[in-house]
Amino acid sequence: MCGIVGYVGKRDCTEVLLNGLGKLEYRGYDSAGIAVFQDGKITVAKSKGRLKDLEEKMEREGRPFGHVGIGHTRWATHGEPSDVNAHPHSGGRVTIVHNGIIENYKELKDFLAGKGVTFTSDTDTEVVAKLLDYRYNGSPIQTISETVRDLEGSYSLGIIFADHPEQVYACLLYT
């Protein structure tokens, strides 16, 4: 089962997210990642393997710093464990983490591909990120509400929008 952590506050977001993900390690996972608002944009760091692997990767490539972000530990359901399939996933203006299964992700992916949207991972999560971005109209709540109506399955999402740098959105649907 995946683990999701979100943070908005005055402390170093990366530290808070990593600490939160560390508390979820007992659940088991194959990859980990975080997305942090840094210098006016969303910075994503993710890695196959343990949380320690993510921390070592950030030490080599740069550790994001900010005050708002989301984090994730993944237990693969779609796509093999890899850096590419690790969460968070971005659709451009929208970055998400996800727990659960989107049962109709293939149909949604085909719809988006028909509109010229491209994909880099094998995950249902990237499909949701791209669908949110495709539908984004400047209103996160309206976009999320319209998008989740089309998602079939049981899931929870942590979402950040590039133009709303002080907010983390979450939704949950279990059928």
Where in this protein do the model-derived segments appear?
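Conserved short alpha-helical segments that host acidic/polar catalytic motifs at enzyme active sites
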Residues: 1-172
